[in-house]
Amino acid sequence: MATLFTNMLNSSFIILDGGMGQELVKRAKHKLTPLWSADVLRDHPDLVVEIHRDFIQAGADVITLSSYAATPTRLAKYNRQDEFEALQKFAINAAKQACHEMGLSTLIAGTLPPLPGSYRPSERLGSHLSQQEYQRILDQQYKHVDLFLCETMASIEEACISTSVAMKSGLPVWTALTVNEKNGSFLRSGEHIIKAAQAVLAEGASALLVNCSTPETTTQALNELAPHVKTMGAYANGFLTVEPLQGHATVDLLKSRQEINPNTYAEFAQEWLLKGAKILGGCCEIGPEHIEKIRSLRQNDDYEEIIKDY
């Protein structure tokens, strides 16, 4: 597995998929609830397979399990904790089916997300409870995935706990940080991104990424990380702001940025490549069309010369 990743990185850059959740919103026409993505995973697994396939077709080398919302804490909040194992299995089966149907060597990433919900660094379970919960998720996923993605980590504590648990799998671990909407030098917790990078890399992560942040602050964050991180990446979102979600709203209150179309997103992605990113993809509001444009950067004959001249 290590050789495969090395070959992929040496050839150019690795392409992740885009935002599964917002694609489900657009296609499922399902009633939006705090656990809407889990509802779709349970009720319409065929749609999850379809979206995975579309991202693979667009050029994704890695797809991520669609179990982001299926943490024990989030499920228990709505008295649905008994669905945990079933939802994890639905997500695993959907990803495997999509890879099988496409017949390509696409890798599957397990996901260790924020346990109470995204963008809420002040809502902590405590170190011991967090470790236990991440271990439960890991136990469901590790036999079925090629790597682990600890994503949308909003604080150093959250990032380090998830990374340390993921390292127990023996698989590659990539950790993705989400940054302040106005200053990409800081996590949403207010902690400096360099301190976060140092702490996460000390836990053993083999790549450090910035995710579910605006493209502009993602660029800022990569500027900070570049001198300190050997393998870094980015997958930004297309939201105007995520502040409503900090108040436990549903995603229908979030507004997308119409200017973040596939072409403009690819322009940001090219800038990230020039800063040294080796892993690129998309988060919320970034669909297969955006990923296809990122793939076109890899197909650009001038790409290697651009990097050499930078």
Where does each model-flagged region fall?
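Domain-level signal for soluble alpha/beta catalytic cores
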Residues: M1-Y310
